[in-house]
UniProtKB/Swiss-Prot annotation:
InterPro entries: SET-MYND_domain_protein, SET_dom, SET_dom_sf, SMYD4_SET, TPR-like_helical_dom_sf, Znf_MYND
SET domain mapped to chain residues: 233-574
Domain of life: Eukaryota
Name recorded for this polypeptide: Protein-lysine N-methyltransferase SMYD4
Catalytic function, reaction form: L-lysyl-[protein] + S-adenosyl-L-methionine = N(6)-methyl-L-lysyl-[protein] + S-adenosyl-L-homocysteine + H(+)
Subunit structure: Interacts (via MYND-type zinc finger) with HDAC1.
Broad enzyme group: transferase
Length: 804
């Protein structure tokens, strides 16, 4: 959650409401963020901090020495059910609560290695085996884990190492026969079996060469931009007194071209929307799975084999290297504040991490620099009086506006270069004047509470790039913050307000499927929140000409359509014309970003407000024509005699149907496939009686039927249902949309598994064409499509194949 937990938010808003009017006016009319921060922090009382401390204790982020056994036993249950992914996550939770170099930690690592082995994650399994041995895996259990190590090595084709491992195991067994009841002959037999298995897989290995595994790190911008870091030379930076900074095309741009490839200046993993559990006797430890269990807290890489922080049970990493980097850069300060940071929300957490990454000295320098350039009144609003005439960076001299630049573009250095650095971050707009007084008060008290905790710790853990006078950092704890902490607090308050408009949701595609299904469904989930100074220069459009994707902490902006030279490069902030109507979009953009959208999509829709989108339309029960009207709907066909019907009645029917579809989706998730099919077929019949053929719910029902039929192995019916869903997706999102790409990916899976080779190859090509516009060749789905295509092309010709 971006803002604090509801209890703390409500508490502070009540505190604001109870303040004398004169105090509210003082804060509301404060001219600088420094004044807002100092006025607000003076109102933070010990009882407020005590209440916040109680809330923070709801998050169990410390290590509980009784937890490893609990999680190991819960993991064993999942393992016996053959839910190896679920087992691995629970073993990871056990690892997070274990102390280093203990039997608890070694057993959790060893058990997790078994789950990873069954998932085919052999390299990762070997790492866990080494970790288990490093942390003191019991001698009595060594044969079991050594055999697993040999099996991994054979599966990876490292037969010489496997033979050496077996020899070591046999030698140990001979020396100490009481270690285990595993015979050397059994080990040799297993080794021989695995060698044969590797030989059989040789051809398959050649079919999927390593060259297919393209990553975003391999993707390069066509030509680096000299004035705009992380951007292509096809992109130019401009500024206008009315619209501010924005990006334009300096040359014609083709669909799919990579325009920006930027690493987040700072990012924080989103803990998810799950509230802290109520810690009773029956639920002392949390078994729920969140993003924090599946992704590295530093680089955001997906992993089932997390390495925990030695000091807390919350922070987890994909490797020892990420753990060490995080500790040195920021986590040594954040570690003891884990529960507090989760209570205060992601924005406050990012504000702290940002200042920790930069270092106290550099934060103070840039604030001092701003103070020297402009009046103290504008210390936190450098953009307020810096109105700049139009300037185009990246366009030729003859194409510049000819206007004289009065001041540099905010965020650029003295040479006019805009880079991914703290100067650029600091110059992102906080929109202080647009935020409500109570919101600024809430943010200021959150930062104040955090500063009090940092001050209480005497800043002993705060990393700085240069030595700082110890007397400045180790001031005694007093109700009034010392001047240095005030600078820190003002910077964090500015960043909290900036994040309201400049935070970038870092998303990933998560694949899900019903039990037993080999055809996956996908959904976009918010993984983390970050700040990208260059990406933040993009203005919004409800019908943008770019798409954004993420790999790890890197954002990639690609052209989703042809962009002409001089045309503005636009990004969607969330409200997209294919997902919501113009009124809802306008409201969301106004409340979060403080502007009224006037993009072509909004202007077009504003002129035809009466016509509702086809994916929300009702149809006539008699003739099937679309219904028209506002509160009372009539059949759109003049020849139809069907009587009018109220919109409320149809909306009520729609809500009932949505509930029934929800029941079917749960049956599908639980693996009750036959019941799910019957439920969905009933929903489909009901939908046909009052919903337009391209209604979104009609597509959702068809998609559910396709997944259920695929799980049952009925590929022909699955393809038929999914093609109906495709028509709905195409009408709503367009034939080249990323949504269309995801749906075509599913259809390709169905044709592939149904052995319909021509249909599969044709669909794979269409899916690749759509996805490459939005995701790039590093995307998991694109790489899976390439593997399917490679497999199909290598098949020998067959005269007859199963029909789909």
């Amino acid at each position: 959650m971006d803002l604090p937990v509801d209890e703390w938010k409500s508490y502070l808003l009540q505190k604001w409401a109870s303040l004398p009017t004169s105090v509210q006016v003082t804060i509301s009319t404060a001219e600088t963020l420094r004044d807002i921060f100092l006025h607000s922090s003076s109102l933070l009382q010990p009882e407020d901090e005590l209440f916040l401390k109680r809330l923070s204790k709801g998050y169990l982020v410390g290590k509980d020495l009784d937890a490893p056994l609990f999680y190991r036993e819960e993991g064993n249950k999942k393992f016996q059910e053959k839910d190896y992914t679920g087992a691995a996550v629970l073993y990871s939770k056990g690892v997070s609560h274990s102390r280093p170099n203990t039997e608890d930690m070694s057993l959790c690592y060893a058990n997790r290695s078994a789950a990873l082995f069954h998932l085919g994650e052999y390299e990762t399994c070997l790492k866990d085996i080494n970790r288990a041995q490093t942390h003191g895996y019991p001698e009595r259990l060594q044969p079991k884990i050594m055999l697993r190590k040999a099996e991994c090595l054979v599966a990876l084709g490292r037969l010489q190492e496997a033979s050496q491992t077996i020899s070591d195991l046999e030698r140990n067994f001979t020396a100490t026969p009481t270690l285990a009841n595993v015979r050397p002959q059994t080990l040799q037999r297993n080794l021989h079996h695995l060698k044969m298995k590797v030989q059989e897989k040789d051809k398959l290995t050649e079919t999927f060469p390593a060259a297919l595994a393209k990553t975003l790190e391999d993707a390069a911008l066509r030509e680096e931009n000299e004035q705009l870091s992380s951007a292509s030379s096809s992109v130019g930076l401009c500024i206008d007194p009315l619209k501010g900074r924005y990006l334009v095309a300096t040359k014609d741009i083709l669909p799919g071209e990579l325009l920006v490839k930027e690493d987040a200046f700072v990012s924080v993993l989103n803990p998810g929307e799950l509230p802290p559990p109520h810690h009773g006797l029956d639920s002392k430890w949390d078994t729920r799975v969140t993003n924090g269990d599946l992704y590295c807290h530093r680089c955001l890489k997906h992993t089932l084999a997390t390495v925990p922080c030695d000091g807390c049970s919350y922070a987890k990493y994909c490797s020892q290297e990420c753990l060490q980097q995080a500790w040195e850069l920021y986590h040594r300060t954040e570690c003891p504040l884990g529960g507090l940071l989760l209570t205060l929300g992601v924005f406050c957490h990012i504000a702290l991490r940002l200042t920790l990454l930069v270092g106290f000295e550099d934060v103070r320098k840039i604030i001092t620099k701003v103070c020297d350039k402009i009046s103290n009144k504008d210390i936190c609003l450098p953009e307020s009086n810096n109105q700049v005439k139009t300037l185009n960076y990246g366009l030729g001299e003859s194409e510049k506006s000819g206007n004289i630049i009065e001041t540099p573009i905010p965020g650029c250095d003295i040479n006019g270069k805009y880079e991914n650095n703290y100067n650029a971050v600091f110059n992102l707009l906080p929109h202080t004047e647009n935020h409500s007084p109570e919101h600024k008060f809430l943010c200021a008290l959150c930062v104040s509470a955090l500063c009090r905790q940092l001050e209480a710790a005497s800043f002993q853990a705060i990393p700085t790039e240069r030595s700082v006078n110890s007397s400045q950092l180790q001031a005694a704890v007093t109700p009034e913050l010392c001047p240095d902490v005030t600078i820190w607090g003002v910077a964090m308050l500015r960043h909290m307000l900036q994040l309201h408009c400049n935070a970038q949701a870092m998303t990933t595609i998560q694949h899900t499927g019903s039990k037993g299904s080999i055809v996956t469904d996908s959904r976009q989930v918010r993984l983390a929140t970050g700040i990208f100074p260059v990406v933040s220069l993009l203005n919004h459009s409800c019908s943008p000409n770019t798409s954004m994707s993420f790999i790890s902490t890197v954002a990639a902006i690609q052209a989703s359509q042809r962009i002409r030279k001089g045309q503005e490069i636009l990004h969607c902030y969330g409200p997209h014309k294919s997902r919501m109507g113009v009124a809802e979009r306008q409201q969301k953009l106004r409340s979060q970003y403080f502007f009224d959208c006037a993009c072509p999509a909004c202007q077009t829709e504003a002129h035809r407000m009466a016509a509702e989108p086809r994916w929300e339309a009702f149809c006539c029960n008699s003739c099937g024509a679309p219904m028209q009207g506002d509160d009372v709907l009539h059949c759109g066909s003049r020849s139809c005699a069907e009587s009018a019907v109220s919109r409320d009645h149809l909306v009520s029917r729609l809500q009932d149907l949505q509930q029934q579809v929800g029941v079917a989706q749960k049956l599908l998730r639980d693996g009750e496939l036959e019941r799910a099919v019957q439920q969905l077929l009933g929903c489909q019949r009901d939908a046909e009686s009052f919903l337009w053929a391209e209604h979104a719910l009609v597509g959702e029902i068809a998609d559910g039927l396709a997944r259920a039929c695929a799980a049952l192995g009925d590929w022909q019916k699955a393809a038929t249902h999914l093609q109906r869903s495709l028509r709905v997706v195409e009408v709503r999102h367009g034939p080249s949309s990323v949504e269309m790409g995801h749906e075509l990916f599913k259809l390709a899976q169905i044709f592939f598994n149904g052995f319909a080779v021509p249909e599969a190859l044709s669909t794979i090509q269409k899916a690749e064409e759509a996805l490459l516009l939005h995701c790039g060749p590093w995307d998991d789905e694109i790489q899976e499509l390439q593997k399917m295509k490679s497999c199909l092309l290598d098949l020998p010709p067959t005269p007859v194949g199963p029909a789909v």
